[in-house]
Amino acid sequence: MRNHDLSPLLRQWIGFDKLANALQSTAEHQAFPPYNIEKSDDNHYRITLALAGFRQDDLDIQLEGTRLTVKGTPEKPETETKWLHQGLVIQPFSLSFTLADHMEVTGATFTNGLLHIDLTRNVPEALAPQRIAISDRPALNS
């Protein structure tokens, strides 16, 4: 599998500078659980975490200010398993994301071992970009 430097693309995320930096630093230090961040349009995003072996009750999602934290604490098995090969990792984790201003968590679902967290960017109308009409009239000072 190839790794690509996405930093030039991350610079285009207006309003997501903090998230891009946090993702880069998290990716360098955090290998579990694997996750994707999907952008469906300019205002809708989805974080998907692969959590095979976890139950919904093992997971906790908290939003404190702009810090979104997902924690997983799997239930300990009653009996010790003797592995011949262990390819699936089921271990406690804590993963944090720093969200941009005006981002809201709109929901979370856990289906088939995938945790989906939906995000929406709601920029107040007063802060949203406004289109300025260009007039044919001469400027006032000319």
Curated annotation (Swiss-Prot):
Keywords carried by this UniProt record: Chaperone, Cytoplasm, Stress response
One of the record's GO cellular component terms: cytoplasm
InterPro entries: A-crystallin/Hsp20_dom, ACD_IbpA/B, HSP20-like_chaperone, HSP20_IbpB
A biological process from GO: protein stabilization
Subcellular location as annotated: Cytoplasm
Homology family: Belongs to the small heat shock protein (HSP20) family.
Protein name: Small heat shock protein IbpB
Organism annotation: Enterobacter sp. (strain 638)
